[in-house]
Amino acid sequence: VRREALLAASACIYAIVLALIAFWPQHVDSAVPSRFWRMLETTIPFITYERVEFGANILLFVPLGILLALLLPARRWLAVPSAALVSAVIETVQGVFISGRTASILDVVANVIGASIGLAIVAIAYRARRRRA
């Protein structure tokens, strides 16, 4: 019971944070000055704004993949399609209803990669746990 309560609480907290980030009226990184990005790209050419944004979108959905895999152990495979659906809904809402945000299919791709990583983490952990038992 304690494990389920902890997972449910974690899922609720994650959902709130995800909603705040996804539905914030402006890009959440709008406070970062553009001169910072120019300096960073000049200093380390590999690190571009687009790559950082793509990586952030991956990281944003790793917890969703983990949580869905743990909450639905018998249907773990649903984690990735569910994450794709959540991401598509977020991008649609951003594109249609939030004028300060931009919808992007690349965000959906990154989010699905993140959820897949989360699912893989759980699968590897379960496999390692079974080997020890």
Regions found by a protein language model. Give the residues of each.
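Individual transmembrane alpha-helices with interfacial aromatic-anchor signatures
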Residues: S104-V109, I113
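Bulky hydrophobic segments
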Residues: V1-R101, I105, L119-A133
